[in-house]
Structure formats: structure tokens, C-alpha cells
Amino acid sequence: MPLHLLIPLLLQHLRSSRLSIAAYMTQPSQTPRILLLVVSLTSLCLSLSFSTASPQTDHRYNVGDPVPLFVNKVGPLNNPSETYEYFDLPFCRPDYLVKKKESLGEVLNGDRLTNALYDLKFREDKTGEILCHKELKGDEIARFRDAITNEYYFQMYFDDLPLWGFIGKVEEESWALDGKGPKYYLFKHVQFNAFYNGNEVIEIRAFSDPNHVVDITEDVETNVKFTYSVFWNATTTLFENRMDKYSRVHWQIHWFSFINSVVLIVLLMGLLIVLFMRHLKNDLIKFASGDEEEDNEVGWKYIHSDVFRCPSQMLLFCAILGTGTQLLTLVSFLFALAFLGILYPYSRGALCTSLVVIYTLTSTVSGYSSASFYSQFSETGWERSVLLSGVLYLGPLFFTVSILNTIAIFYGATAALPFGTIVVIFLVFTVVNIPLLAFGGVIGHRSRSRFEAPSVTKKFPREIPPSAWYRKTTGQMFLGGLLPFSAIILELHNFYASLWGYKIFTLSSILFVTFIILIILIAMLSVGLTYIQLTVEDHEWWWRSVLRGGSTALFMFGYCFCFYAKSNMRGFLQLSFFFGYNACICYAFFLMLATISFRASLVFVRHIYRAVKNE
């Protein structure tokens, strides 16, 4: 059955059910709290269980015990999305390849862990151990040479610790002794330096020895003896701190960004205080005193019968609020997992798994928010609002991922999702996501309350007088997006660098503070710009508050072009993945910030119109 027909049927079934719990949940005062509490606890518990799944080893070894080492992938250094399976290059390979059983998050992350011929045993040193003798043919030489030209690196995991190394090196013409052009050398020896504390592995380093190379400049069959060495050293670092080496933080950059954001907030607060104390407060005093002559000088008082008019495209409007609320809930859970230490750098697949699980479970929040708000204005049609909120973000996301997956399959990259993974994701979102979305919609409709409008809305809308360009939608979107963007641009750069480079964004507290600053700025600007809009008797503030709040995401996406131009990324695969996934991320921010902006404006508008005596 098509999905667009399945959701309304589920909604109708749940709405017509006569479960005893439904009667209890029809109490408006109880339903939101119970629903949010259940969803929150369930999402957090399941995220914890999926992210902290029991490992295959307890990371404790006796002397001589084999320590698991898996090879993962190879790829060009400057293109983090363009990775291929390790044995796509003609390395020494076992007779039988055994794929490590991976979680959903690891597969989504592009990890393809496989066994290798390396035999590393706990606290046993090895020197010049032969990995294999391999006769490289002309086409294999060409593949290695192409990889070296594109600065390919390899990635492995040793006791769940990541390690990297380069495949070879290029000796430019100026350094070549024969002066015949650049020389290409393949590293044939890898040295592992491992560190231990007691019976636990603490650290691993891999060095490709530049003194053990083979010239592969020409496509000539070459016999190569691949070797490796292992040296164990004691350290005092504790096991629980072994990931700290991947978490070096540049505090000066973060502090500069933080101070820049705080200064901007203080300036905006000062402007809003001046605006409200000098103008809005005086207006409220005049209205309270019943001074009709002075009342004629104020514009926003005259549109009290229009400001709470139901906006056009109500289905889409409520779907934006529902999806934005869901994404805000998802981000809150991600920060909670980061503070609990569940999400950390190089925790393979934990982030992707958490995203899938939390988004699926919080679909209840989307259905509830969309249906409850829509039902305040209409008794019918809320099912379509719930349906739209279910596809508003997932639809574009699935479309983008499908295109990117097709490109990855064409290139043979590890980013291509296996068919089994696609089936699992499809089942998750149909068997779990859709019923939860429908359930939230039913609860939201049944627990609806009357829309709290301080004044009665007239039947016909008041004509909006012409205004200057900077007071129209485009001007307010530019101002409402530029100021918050300027406050987060430094941290945004670090965020992009961690996604598309090799910078580790480890301070979740800094990222959390930046996100809170962004929310505060969006809310403050929304309130101020809404008041300015109302003073010129423009009562259509609903959609404008959404657009100017989400406009910050447009600046974020625009910065992607600048970031890409300054980076060393190249190739169609990396280009498509960079802009495709950034578009999905910025679209999510658009929905979240639009929701925040509207909610802030709604609270403000209700407050000022409650404070006046409406005739």
C-alpha cells in the first residue's frame, strides 16, 4: 500500500479506537506532559542502548594474546567522503576475507572493517615481520601510483583505536637524482608503536617507513616484500583517558568566538531595551490611561483584530512547526548523549545510530505539535497536516540520499549503502516512524485547546499600507539572518571543518553554548522585527517570523560555497556529497530556527495585546 494512503488509515484507526488510555489522555493538562515524558525517556534509553552496545572484547589482554586489528578503508586525503574498501588496492590480503559485523551506524558512516594479515599480539615486539611476498603487475602498479598521486591514506582500527598512514610518497623532479621527473614510491614497511597500561591497550601509532620503499614510477612488474614491525611501550595513561589524544582543543579560537557572540547579544539587548522602554512602554501607558487622542498616534493598536488571523497555507505552516519541534528535540538528545560521554570522536557509528533512533522515536513530537496547533483553528484536516509534517524533512532527505547513493555506487565508494541497509532503514521508518507519527497526531488533536487570542478577529482582513523595502519580508530576512550568522560564523567554520576535514570538534559544551546563543539571537531579533512590522500596521507577521528565523540557515548554506572554495576538496563525488548533505543540514536548521522565531513572536504579540484595553 502506498505510504500516502497508509498514514491517513492509521490515523483514522487510532482516532476511532476506544482504548481506556485515550480517555485519560484527552485531558489537556495531562497529555502533553505524559507524551513528552514517555518519548523523552524512551528515546534516551534506546539511544543509550544502541550507542553503548556490548563490544566483542573487554579490552583486557594477557601477554601474547592477539589484539584485534581490522583494516577499514582508503581514500584521498582531501576528499573525506571519497573512501573505498581497503582491498580495492592490491595490498596483501588473507585467503578468506571476514567482514566484521557492523552496526547500522557504522554502515551509514561508510565503515567496512575487514580482517588482515597483520598479527599483533599483546606486548610482543616484532621486527621486520614478513606480511607477504607480492608480485605487482603493471595495472596494479598503476593503481598504486594513482593512489599516491591523490595522496591516499589508509585507516585501520586496533582494539577500537583508529590509526592512519600514507600509502606512498612522490619525489618531485627537483629532488629526483636523475632529473627525469617525479618519482613515485610505495611504502612497503609499516611500524606500529603500541602503548599499554597493565593489561590494556592505551594508544597505537603507525609509521610508514620512508627508508623502505619501492619505485613504481614505471608500469613494470615488480616483486615486493611487504613487512611490518611492532614495538610495545608502557605508559601511565589510564584506559578511560585513551581517547584524549584525539581531543586536542584550541581554546583561543573558541573564546574569541564566544566573546564575539556575547558582545552581539549585549548590543541587541540594549537596542531592544531602548525600543521597548521608550516606545512600547509609553504606548502601553497611553492605552491603560484611555487617552484616545494619543492612541491615534500608534499603529499597532489598530490591527488588534487582525494580528491573530489564521495564516494562509495553514497545513504547511503547522507542518513546519511540527518538524521544527521534532528536530529541536533531536538536537537536545544529541547534546545529552554528548554530555553523558556516549558520543565522542571516532566512536564508530554512534552518531548515525543515534540520529536514526532518536528521529524515529521523536516523530511522535512532530505529529503532536502539528496536530495540536492545527486543531486550534480547524476541526478537520489535521490528518493532512500530520502527513505533511512526516514528509516535510524526510522527503527531501530521502531524495538527496538516493541521488548521492547512486553516485557512490557508480564510483564504488564505501559511502554507497548496501541493499540490506536500505531495506532496514525503510522498515524502521514505515513500521516504527509512521505509527508513532500517527499516534502523536491523534493525541495532539484530542488534547487541543482553544487558541488564546486576546482580541476578536474580524471577518475581513485590514488592508496593509505600503512600507519601505527594509520593512518588507526580504529586508527582514536579510537582517534577521545576517546578525545571528555573524555571531556563529567562527564556530560554524569549526563545525564544517569537523564534518568535512580532520579537525576534531570535541567540546560539546562550546557547541551547546553556541547553539543557545543562536536561539537567543533568533528570538530577540524575531521579537524586535515583529514589533517594527506591527507599528506600520502590517498584521501578516506569522509567515514572516518563520522566514526571517529560518533565513540564518540560508547564510549557513551560502558559507558552504566559501568553505569549499578555500578547501582542497575536488572531484564530482566529493562535490555532490558536500553540498548535498550540507543542504540537508541547513534545511534542518531552517525548520528549527523558524519554529523558534515564530514561538518567540507569538509569545510577544500575545503579551502586548493582553496589556491593552481592546474595544
State what each model feature region is:
Residues 257-273, 428-435, 516-524, 581-594:
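Single-pass alpha-helical transmembrane segments
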Residues 270-285, 434-453, 521-535, 592-610:
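Transmembrane-helix exit/juxtamembrane "anchor" motif
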Residues 244-409, 442, 446-447:
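Hydrophobic alpha-helical transmembrane segments corresponding to the first two to three helices
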Residues 48-258:
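Soluble extramembrane domains flanking the early transmembrane region of eukaryotic membrane proteins
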